[in-house]
Amino acid sequence: MMNDVIMDLSTLISKLKDKSPFKYNFKVNSEEFWLSESSNETYVEPDFSIISEISNCNLEEAQVILISAVGATGKSELTKRLSYSLKIPVVDLGQTKVVGGNSLTGLIFQHLKPLEGGQWLEDIQNGKTCMIIDALDEGYQKTNTQGFFDFLDDVGEKISKDDCSFIMLGRTNAIELASLYLDGQGIKVAVLQIEPFSLEKAKEFIDKQVCKTNTLSAQHEVSYKATRDYVLDSLGDFFKAKGKQDEEQGNKFIGYAPVLLAISEFLNSQKVGNYKMLFEKLKKSKVKSISLILDIMHRILERDKTYKVVPNLIMGIVKNRSTEFKKVALRDAYTEEEQCARVLYILLGEDYPFKPVDDEAFDIEYRKGLVTWMPDHPFLKGRKPANVVFECYILAKLIGNNKYKDAVYRYLNKTQISSFMFFYLFKELNKKQNIDAEIIVTTQHPYGHE
């Protein structure tokens, strides 16, 4: 898809600043309809581009603004910042029980007094204010396609003829479907996409993560920034050496939020202790950029298991099981290799065929839970790789495993990949293994993914 017009969050907010702030009281506090009343000081404002292929107007003309975001790019924090800055409430479809015809109207009157709810909807329709709807993709999962369209019809009935009435956020697939449907209903839609951070914003992101729990002294700050820049420069140099197209991929990789979180963990002040010593160690060992990339991959995968899937899915499934079973499940489920394989099967459009834990009851609940979690995996952008680095890492990691080898070759036979990236990663991951002639033949394609 072609992306045009880069703008920052402040520019987007300024285009909606004439909207009247929400002035009513909710009947009860809830997670499905709320107003953000605080600002996250560690939040770094993203930039956006307009996806021209699925937009039918510019931002100024839009009756609906759709914001597309892949998993782990800070969509939830963006929603909070929009709500806080504009003083406009959020309907979170991830928390609602029902999504369908009139469900939006019903939700509003469930949480507001009748006269106030009616007045607020009238103000939306007259263009005086607007509403934020988050987790459009999760709403789609709770219904069928017709139910989703019925929900969008409910939205359409409340739209101003001349002004923006709704800002809706969600994953790529649901946003694209909503855009096509609303366009078919004659509604003016502008679709935005969250862009990777620029180098300066990447540095700001890392700084805020590293310093959020521990302020650095002036002396430590100088050494910290030198170490931070060394890591970012090492990663950037790896891509620059391979040509302009790969340099652009490198900028996208370095500016991707999950990558920056991994770098922040690597530079965590409580773990590092002495930045000057770390900096000298990195320089002295001439640490290769490929080693840094592998460290980042490990941290991203470890983080997805430790902070997301274990507490939010696995622990709930095993809570009534024996101590020994819990130990096995926590060890064997959602390993780094399994995560890579599950992403590969999603890219192939196939179901994952293996059981990481040999227990039918666990497997049923685990598979069901991952239907929700896997689309948000940081290696994915919809049903495509989030970045060429993730794509090649998955293939290089799995191709030496007989369990997944056929799936890797099926992917290679139908997809163009970055050969140089694949071979660099393969060599580093499989130091004791020679490269098969079949791998060389299969991967000799021109550069593939954007």
What do these predicted regions represent?
Residues 2-13, 129, 352-356, 366-382, ...:
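Extended amphipathic alpha-helical scaffold segments
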Residues 1-292:
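P-loop NTPase signaling cores
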Residues 175, 183-186, 197-203, 211-212, ...:
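Extended hydrophobic
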Residues 66, 78, 385, 390, ...:
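Aromatic-residue hotspot detector
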